[in-house]
């Protein structure tokens, strides 16, 4: 398309002052460089938007394209290391990094990535002198006290390291109910229970065996990362490591067994720091505290057990960052967007329901592929780049749509939706909130799609050729290649569920797995992205571990890795803006020119208001009142993947 710039616009361009081109003096320190970079990014963002508007080039005014035009604009890239994705973001959809991220946080991140060190920059990461956990926690507390009034950094917001009990079994376990990855804890299978029972007998753990025999059915759960090697294309006993970027790092595939009491206390019982295909080939350690009420053990000094818990959370970092967050929200939603743009006309009701939940996702994902994964994730992970990319591709290809619908997912993992408000599950706030949010969103979608104007019966869905084309595009090897997407959608209920799922991924699910990262991950000892010393090869070796062994596993001598581990969660956890939350979406929907959407939007707004009150109660019922669970509160819930 040719864009003509009027004479008056050209004169305006000649006379305009471009603040982002002003020559600034060489910075004298980190804070000065950060201030200059942040101001420059913000000015550039505003100037670029203004220039586009006055030149009438891809302006901020919405444009409508025909289905053929969209098909031509949205093409697949199928030949790089990533799952199928958009080849090139169309100019009218392209959003710059400074418009997506906080300019200050982005500038901080770029300074860290580019290794532009200044004398006072070293304060953002500890050094070898912080060689005990007590020194590390004191350092973290002091950094939070030292925040200036102008330039804020990753220590401006609280993190888990400010808790005196951050390392305890209670706080460790609760992270799998209300932390960044609360989506994968699963009822232990008979196979796992048999394996742990046999190992407990071999190690003479009589109290553990007695608990296995006396506990009610469905009392044991696992966080299971044992399939990492298979999914990454590694051999069962292959050592997982990454020696790029000048720092040797190790990955692990841990398994943690938990006991969930009838009153809802989740307690870790046993850990395999790195599962290598069988229990015999792996190391298994049992908790000295079989009973969660046992206070006879000094948890602070139980270094073998603390090391094992660190392995679990490091494994969880990998699953969360690469799969639960990146793949299962960002990349999967991009496939939905591209397929819908190619096969659904702008006036199609499904397209109209989904489009508001896309916003900056395509530009954000392009940045992730070009920068975040190769320049951040790979340099701090404990797995090689080929293993990481294989892990992501495998997860994308095998993404199981219907089994991940919220009610089905919770049921399959051992959390019956009709029992979520019982004492046993009262601490699983993610499950309680996300299930109610799914029900609310499904009600909204259903009230629109089931209207007689759109799909009065199943036959009207089965006869919709564009819906069938969308299914084909999602499954095709020349499209998204997601063969677990339905081969066809032929009933109203099936369509309602799928549209609800697409909104769920973009809004509540992404919010749940993204916005808690700063709190749980900027304090690196809680959840390191990798281990910086080899893992133990026998239980005898692990049982001899002292504090120095755990400290050696942390990146105290790898400052860049520490900084990236801490900074990226801070970059990605910026507070959701009011115009980006689900409440504003409902308000906008309530004034839609389509009366059906408007009516549904008004009901959605009312339902969200009720949910806000319910979620406050759910958080107040948590045993742990030190860290509220409010990430899914409607006013904090992002309407789309905006960061």
From Swiss-Prot:
Temperature notes for this entry: Optimum temperature is 37 degrees Celsius. Optimum temperature is 35 degrees Celsius.
Catalysed reactions, semicolon-separated: (9Z,12Z)-octadecadienoate + O2 = (13S)-hydroperoxy-(9Z,11E)-octadecadienoate
Cofactor: Mn(2+)
Keyword Acetylation: no
Influence of pH: Optimum pH is 7.0.
Family in the record: Belongs to the lipoxygenase family.
Name this polypeptide is given: Manganese lipoxygenase
Species of the source: Pleurotus sapidus
Source taxonomy: Eukaryota, Fungi, Dikarya, Basidiomycota, Agaricomycotina
Protein encoded by which gene: LOX1
